[in-house]
């Protein structure tokens, strides 16, 4: 994998890419909020010699810092599109975990004919019709909750809440430790991410799935209403769904072989 970067007005995005054949499918991996490229290390290890792959550290995360938290989900989708164009990727399948899945939906909203497939991992629909007013209100006010908890408590809750296996929990803890020198940065990032998500939902855009799609969700996903959303998404849109046994919110780390 080669590390590359892309400059934006808010900061520099770092990503890793390995292109074998530009005409073939490229797997584009998008980690969730507060996670980074390491979330997909098992998938990259498996696919990098077989498929074109790209994975990024999202803006304001890990290597993509410092970064000014003054952008929207549509800005992120535009930057992702520009990175994909820069790397001459013509046939992307976008695989988004949690917030990465929301970003993939925004990308489809802006560039419906520039995507070949979408895989949602423990994410949920961006359409406003799925959300209650209370849920949106809570998203906008998450930051103070993160600031209340001592960092050690957050570390424990974050790793155990996202994963069921030792590997998954240790990996989440490792990614969270990127913010160990400034836990308030972690709280600001989480709060900003949830507010950005709320704004995208309130925009009430169609967020039509414009390509073949697959929903993946851990049977033990405890993050918000992820399981409930995925059931409704599957029922309303007719999207195929795969439930992962013994897996939490980061199901791809709990059961990578599935």
Residue ranges and their predicted role:
Residues 1-12:
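N-terminal cap/lid segment of alpha/beta-hydrolase-fold proteins
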Residues 14-66:
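Conserved HGGG/HGGXW glycine-rich cap/lid loop of the alpha/beta-hydrolase fold
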Residues 42, 106-110:
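Active-site signature of alpha/beta-hydrolase-fold catalytic machinery across serine-
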Residues 54-95:
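Active-site loop/oxyanion-hole signature of alpha/beta-hydrolase fold enzymes
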Residues 96-100, 104:
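Gly/Ala-rich beta-loop-alpha elbow adjacent to hydrolase catalytic centers
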Residues 109, 116-148:
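Flexible "cap/lid" loop of the alpha/beta hydrolase fold
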Residues 129-131, 148-208:
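Conserved alpha/beta-hydrolase catalytic His-Asp/Glu region
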Residues 210-247, 253:
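Conserved loop-alpha-helix segment in the C-terminal half of the alpha/beta-hydrolase fold
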